[in-house]
Amino acid sequence: MTDYVLESRCCGTKFADEKWELDCPNRDGAALIFANYAKKQLEVKENLPGLYKYSDWLPVCRTLDGSGAPVTYKSEGLAGELGLSDLYITFNGYWPEKGALMKTGAFKECEAYAVCARINDLNDKVMVVASAGNTARAFARVCSENNIPLLLCIPQDCIDAMWSAKPLNPCVKLVATERGSDYFDAIYLSNIICELDKFYPEGGAKNVARRDGMGTTVLSAVTTIGRIPDYYFQAVGSGTGAIAAWEANKRFIVDGRYGNNLMKLMVSQNIPFTPMYDAWKAGSRALLPVDDTVARKQAEEICANRKPPYSLKGGLFDALTETGGDMFAISNEEAMEGMVLFERTEGIDIEPAAGVAVASLKQAIRTGAVETDAVIMLNITGGGIAKFKKENKVVYKQPDCVFALDTDPDTIKETVMELFI
């Protein structure tokens, strides 16, 4: 079991992780809590499976079967194409030839294996996860293979993301919000369900295990490169992964063996839904006002989060500000070009979000926002799915129930209770 305490970014209160803590006991409100680990220098434990080799900086009390870890390597193909001398790619997905064994094809597995191994006194209840698709697929795999009761809430339009190599354990149930809904609607549904005593929220960005699981991408990169990178590139839907990268970076500064710089967070959003980009470029901590109907439609198109952890203390605005980072807006055409470029130069298929990150790196080079001799970490958040599906027959999980957006909360509660009888 990892030795750590939780700490509030707002008031500095330190407290034990006893009851699936998601907030400071002082109820600071708009602030993230974080894990303060007793071991300040990271020891990579190669004798532990997958992700858990980084357990010194993961809030876990056990290991689970089946995890894979991010894999970092120095690029030759893409780096040569872009004229970069020190480009390192951190690959999350399925690419056995590189040692990447995430069978859902995305770094959401890093979150799921960390969250499900966290101290939990609620094991007799059902964890609820709201997702736009990839996170749900990852949690479904982890919980199915480790017999952990789980209820997933996703927009029905994202149902194609719910594939797996084999049928899911009956302990995993799936409910969806009707077509035309988005991730925020799935979150709203999950909140209604969590009013029932039988269910508890996974927590999203507020869950320290989710963020520190994501942060293993940086642990992989820094321990492979031997120093903290100068720049960090990633596409973001909610910004949680970039927040996690910032937090991991600061732990390495305390570690003292890898440098004392903060890598500049260079994060990107996919046009047309760019609320964080718009706020950042306007110099605003608060997200800018937008018509709810327009936001719903745009977010639905790319399965994005209308209410990201951008403004709160310790959120993406603070991370970008402290690191001197920047944001990019990338079109679908640019993202597709990024996907094609990566597969041509590196030899593996990547997901659209990763294509957005590649496109943002191209844009940054073109505009002179980064130096060609800088040490750059490119976080490929998903890849190898086409390869996995070619090598394996997959099955799709259909919703156990689909709810209209105007469904009465009591009806929702009665329906989901029946799923776990």
Over which residues does each language-model region extend?
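PLP-dependent amino-acid enzyme catalytic core
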Residues: 1-421
